[in-house]
């Protein structure tokens, strides 16, 4: 069973490690989303795999006519909707049609870049790890943090960060233009 205080691996490696198509796809996703290594991609795939497995099990239990299946399905769909992975009013089939990009788009690193707080996806990662970004008033230093739909608009520079000042040279030009400062 293992020691409960020890962290355990949260991902699975691919079964065929040298498959050319998969490797090319992984490299493209790593570049697009600014991931540090393939392990981060595999963690996101594990999250996706978990929700797909739950979706398949719930569809099977609904087909058998189990009473709790509807309640559990609503809970899973509600959770994925809160994170913005699914749209409101989605059904169990939508869980099975999720893609890895749906998970990667909800990462804090991607959200910081998409909102224009950083010039590049790599700079977004650096801002987060150096503690320059806050979500809902709390400093977050984990680029893989999954941002909830309600917290999207609360992503900003941390108040104690030098980047919070208007004239900082590393601030994105999009933000300077949006706040009314000079570019």
Swiss-Prot record:
Q: Which SUPFAM superfamilies match?
A: Alpha-L RNA-binding motif
Q: Which InterPro entries match?
A: Ribosomal_uS4 (IPR022801), Ribosomal_uS4_arc (IPR022802), Ribosomal_uS4_CS (IPR018079), Ribosomal_uS4_euk/arc (IPR005710), Ribosomal_uS4_N (IPR001912), S4_RNA-bd (IPR002942), S4_RNA-bd_sf (IPR036986)
Against PROSITE patterns, the record matches this protein to: RIBOSOMAL_S4, S4
Which Pfam families does the record match to this protein? Answer: Ribosomal_S4 (PF00163), S4 (PF01479)
Q: Single GO molecular-function term?
A: structural constituent of ribosome
This entry carries the following GO cellular component terms, namely: small ribosomal subunit
**Coiled-coil segments on the chain, per record:** none
GO BP terms: namely:
ribosomal small subunit biogenesis; translation
The alphabetical list of record keywords is: Ribonucleoprotein, Ribosomal protein, RNA-binding, rRNA-binding
Q: Which residues form the S4 RNA-binding domain?
A: 106-168
Q: Which cysteines are joined by disulfide bonds?
A: none
Entries under NCBIfam families matching the protein: PRK04051.1, uS4_arch
Oligomer and partners: Part of the 30S ribosomal subunit. Contacts protein S5. The interaction surface between S4 and S5 is involved in control of translational fidelity.
Q: What does this protein do?
A: One of the primary rRNA binding proteins, it binds directly to 16S rRNA where it nucleates assembly of the body of the 30S subunit.
Designated name of the protein: Small ribosomal subunit protein uS4
- Gene designation per UniProt: rps4
């Amino acid at each position: 069973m293992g020691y409960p205080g020890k962290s355990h691996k949260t991902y699975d490696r691919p079964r065929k490690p040298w498959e050319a198509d998969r490797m090319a796809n992984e490299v493209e996703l790593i570049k697009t989303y600014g991931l540090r290594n393939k392990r981060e991609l595999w963690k996101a795939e594990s999250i996706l795999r978990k929700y797909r497995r739950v979706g398949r099990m719930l569809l099977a239990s609904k087909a058998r006519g189990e009473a709790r299946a509807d309640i559990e399905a609503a809970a899973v769909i509600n959770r994925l909707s809160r994170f913005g992975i699914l749209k409101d009013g989605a059904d169990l089939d939508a869980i099975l049609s999720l893609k890895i990009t749906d998970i990667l788009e909800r990462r804090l690193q991607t959200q910081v870049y998409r909102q224009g707080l950083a010039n590049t996806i790599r700079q977004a990662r650096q801002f987060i790890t150096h503690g320059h970004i806050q979500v809902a008033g709390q400093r977050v230093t984990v680029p893989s943090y999954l941002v909830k739909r309600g917290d999207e608009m609360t992503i900003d520079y941390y108040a104690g960060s030098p980047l919070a000042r208007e004239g900082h040279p590393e601030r994105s030009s999009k933000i300077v233009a949006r706040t009314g400062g000079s570019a």
